[in-house]
């Protein structure tokens, strides 16, 4: 059984399809309630009016992830505001590759940097040496968090949600 919909749809709907298929509806709803309770407890502790960007870095360069994806939905529930460019990706999971000259379009109060493999890590390490990167206000403020690209840009579900919430809590509150 495969849920109908795409990566921009509500992740909870797909989660419920899997719970139904496994005849674990009650357990599935309990897991969603746990996520909601964790969000409700975390949200008031986070800084108000904070903008965030989720940037996936690969060997070709950075892409801004849509604010409508799974992670964007969670960040929105936490009261964190998506960067303007992330809001403009209505029908796509991410922007085109951003040049270093356009990297400022991905700036926010906090940037979560996701990489998928060692080649992406190498490209990110090289970018960190570029003036366009070091001038980002998030970088200047030390508000840069490296996160798992598989979870932050390619996953959804209960375990992924818990990891995203762990990462946000670690970055913004510690």
Stretches found by the model and what they are:
Residues 44-46, 93-116:
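Ligand-binding pocket segment of bilobal, Venus flytrap-like solute-binding proteins
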Residues 63-68, 123-124:
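Short, well-ordered secondary-structure micro-motifs
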Residues 66-96, 151:
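Alpha-helical, coiled-coil/dimerization segments enriched in small aliphatic residues
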């Amino acid at each position: 059984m495969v849920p109908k919909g795409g990566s921009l749809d509500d992740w909870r709907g797909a989660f419920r399809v899997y719970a139904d298929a496994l005849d674990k509806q009650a357990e599935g709803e309990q897991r969603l309630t746990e996520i909601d309770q964790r969000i409700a407890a975390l949200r008031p502790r986070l800084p108000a009016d904070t903008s965030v960007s989720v940037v996936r870095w690969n060997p070709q360069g950075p892409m801004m992830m849509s604010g409508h994806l799974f992670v964007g939905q969670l960040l929105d529930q936490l009261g964190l505001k998506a960067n303007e460019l992330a809001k403009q990706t209505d029908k796509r999971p991410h922007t085109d590759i951003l040049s270093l000259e356009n990297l400022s379009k991905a700036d926010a109060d906090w940037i979560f940097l996701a990489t998928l493999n060692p080649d992406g890590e190498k490209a990110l390490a090289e970018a960190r040496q570029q003036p366009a990167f070091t001038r980002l206000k998030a970088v200047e403020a030390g508000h840069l968090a490296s996160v798992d690209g598989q979870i932050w840009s390619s996953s959804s579900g209960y375990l992924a949600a818990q990891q995203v919430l762990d990462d946000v809590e670690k970055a913004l509150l510690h």
